[in-house]
Amino acid sequence: MDINLRDYCTADLDALGQLFYETVHTVNAVDYTPEQLDAWAPGSIDRTRWDRTLTEHFTRIAQIGDQIVGFGDLADDGYLDRLYVHRDFQHCGIATALCDALEEHARLQGVLVVETHASITARPFFEKRGYRVIREQQVERAGVWMTNYVMERKL
């Protein structure tokens, strides 16, 4: 399976929104309630905010052939904001390839620590990459509370 990583462009926005929704509602369903999933990924993204942050951040899109199979973005301060892989392409090395690219970019920018807020589902992936849990936290999305973890990795 040949994974191609490329830069984000605004034309990707609809595909990323759909991938985000489907991934959250399937992959994360093992760890979160339907109410939490609906609050996290309600079916439509804030297109203006997403496009702005995906453009401002270092964003990588993973493709296999013509299909977008994942994406991730990193802010200038080392905050890994989003990392999502298509539900049909889990455990294929896509998240690893995306994280490798994001972390290498951070290193080249002089960032010493990458931080993320990882879901219950994603925590083991990040732990295998050397991230450590700083704290568990309860976050509110659309009036619904859910657990995630502030995690960091020293580069």
Predicted features along the sequence, with ranges:
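Extreme N-terminal starter segment of soluble prokaryotic enzymes
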Residues: 2-4
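Acetyl-CoA-dependent GNAT
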Residues: 7-10, 18-90, 99-101, 105, ...
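Charged catalytic carboxylate motif
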Residues: 15
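Short secondary-structure boundary/hinge segments and terminal tails
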Residues: 84, 107, 124, 143-144
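Conserved G/P- and acidic residue-centered "switch" motifs that form tight phosphate/ATP-binding loops
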Residues: 93-95
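Alpha-helical structural signal in soluble globular domains
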Residues: 101, 128-129
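Conserved GNAT acetyl-CoA-binding A-motif
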Residues: 106-119
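C-terminal "cap" of GNAT-fold acetyltransferases
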Residues: 117-123, 129, 136-155
